[in-house]
């Protein structure tokens, strides 16, 4: 599949549909003051990942030494962050040499999360310079690292006491923790997606969903028709924990197949609003919506 941001109708012309599922949480100063607080051993310090060394005047040898130290620190933190990102259940391929640039998309700045002197994760922040507010564009943490400790760390290290953070479906523990402290949450669309290989995308997303919660056993066929007129009969089968999705290009529908346009399929299979549609009656509720999600940092 392909994905991008931007105005909906502009890209719908090319087959991109607004869909996907993402959950955003908002927190404020009162949540930090009165909500659950991390233990001392869980506390997080935010350390900026250097983007470049300032040009200092003075002793040339000292300047060179400072630049070398800064470059070494940048390389170390960037590689630790990249290696951690590579272990994510849902990810877009990011080459090591471009990883830092991608984290800086949309004006964000990357920060390393330090716990007890060791690297514990990273965040990409868009900070409002006029207020003590930030948007966490991406937050990736080592296993066992507290998300609420990161929010408190933002206040302690950077003076940021309110903001929003978006979390993907696979991070169930992080979602539960944020639900305990945050003021509100919002479930909405991700970006604009163009699905080019329905069987492959459905297989990957069904496997991810099954990783988080079991899928009911059944077999169903979706007839998905593209704007070009191409129709693919997508057969989904879940049996004994095994997921099989195949696609067959044929024009004539058969009895029992559910007919959808590509745009309808994108909205119904990948959006939380699918519960309001009748077209998917008979399909197990545990199958859909599927957790199609990519970080906004990749949408640049």
Where are these regions (language model features)?
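Active-site/acyl-donor-binding loops of N-acyltransferases
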Residues: 9, 15-34, 141-148, 152-300
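Short, glycine/charge-rich beta-strand/loop segments that flank catalytic centers
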Residues: 1-11
């Amino acid at each position: 599949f392909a994905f991008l941001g931007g105005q909906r109708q502009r890209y719908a012309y090319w087959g991109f549909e607004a869909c996907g599922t993402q959950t955003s949480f908002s927190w404020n100063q009162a949540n930090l003051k009165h909500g659950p607080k991390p233990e001392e051993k869980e506390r997080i310090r935010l350390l900026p990942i250097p983007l470049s060394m300032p040009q200092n005047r003075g002793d040339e040898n000292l300047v060179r030494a400072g630049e070398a130290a800064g470059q070494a620190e940048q390389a170390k933190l960037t590689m630790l962050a990249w290696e951690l990102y590579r272990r994510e259940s849902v990810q877009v391929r990011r080459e090591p040499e471009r990883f830092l640039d991608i984290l800086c998309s949309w004006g964000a700045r990357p920060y390393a999360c330090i716990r007890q002197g060791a690297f514990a994760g990273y965040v990409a922040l868009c900070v409002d310079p006029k207020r003590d507010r930030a948007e966490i564009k991406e937050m990736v943490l080592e296993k066992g690292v507290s998300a609420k400790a990161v929010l408190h760390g933002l206040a302690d290290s950077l003076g940021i006491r309110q903001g929003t953070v978006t979390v993907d479906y696979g991070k169930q523990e992080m979602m539960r923790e944020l639900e305990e402290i945050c003021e509100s949450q919002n479930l909405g669309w991700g970006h604009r997606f163009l699905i080019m290989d329905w069987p492959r995308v459905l297989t990957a997303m069904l496997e991810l969903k099954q990783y988080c919660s079991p899928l009911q056993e059944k077999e169903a066929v979706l007839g998905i028709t593209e704007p070009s007129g191409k129709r693919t009969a997508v057969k989904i089968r879940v049996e004994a924990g095994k997921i099989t999705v195949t696609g067959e290009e044929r024009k004539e529908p058969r009895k029992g197949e559910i007919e959808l346009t590509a745009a309808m399929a994108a909205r119904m299979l990948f959006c939380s609003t699918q519960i309001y549609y009748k077209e998917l009656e008979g399909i197990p509720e545990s199958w859909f919506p599927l957790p199609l999600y990519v970080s906004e940092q990749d949408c640049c």
